Amino acid sequence: MARGGFPGGMGNMNNLMKQAQMLQKQMQSMQEEIEASEFEGSAGGGAVVAKVNGKKELIALNIKPEVVDPDDVEMLEDLVFSAVKQALEKASEETSEKMGKLTGGMGMPGLF
């Protein structure tokens, strides 16, 4: 064993550091790509459509006039809630899938 307790000496440590830096750059690039993406969710057969970006921010909400009923506000609230929730779930799934491929299932919980 080489000095410092690292098998193979400092060469292996340098390689590990380079790999970690490369992975960090790839993850940052992937995160930027995801943040620029848009995800759509809909409810009521497309009567309500919500769009979020990869930062999970609501960027658009479209409501068809025929679903606006002043006597049934609760239905409209449910449709909006469902559409936004679906869009957010798509954003989360895409983020997890892409980052999972990049990290190779290294088990890095809480990153994304």
UniProtKB/Swiss-Prot annotation:
Residues 91-112 are annotated as: Disordered. Residues 102-112 have a biased composition (Gly residues). GO terms for cellular component: bacterial nucleoid; cytosol. Its main location: cytoplasm. InterPro entries: YbaB-like_sf (IPR036894), YbaB/EbfC (IPR004401). Disulfide bonds: none annotated. The keyword Cytoplasm applies. GO terms for molecular function: DNA binding. SUPFAM superfamilies: YbaB-like. It is found in: Cytoplasm, Nucleoid. Residues 91-100 have a biased composition (Basic and acidic residues). Transmembrane segments: none annotated. The keyword Nucleotide-binding does not apply. Keywords: Cytoplasm, DNA-binding. Homodimer. Belongs to the YbaB/EbfC family. Binds to DNA and alters its conformation. May be involved in regulation of gene expression, nucleoid organization and DNA protection. This is Nucleoid-associated protein CPE0046. It comes from Clostridium perfringens (strain 13 / Type A). The lineage of its organism: Bacteria, Bacillati, Bacillota, Clostridia, Eubacteriales.
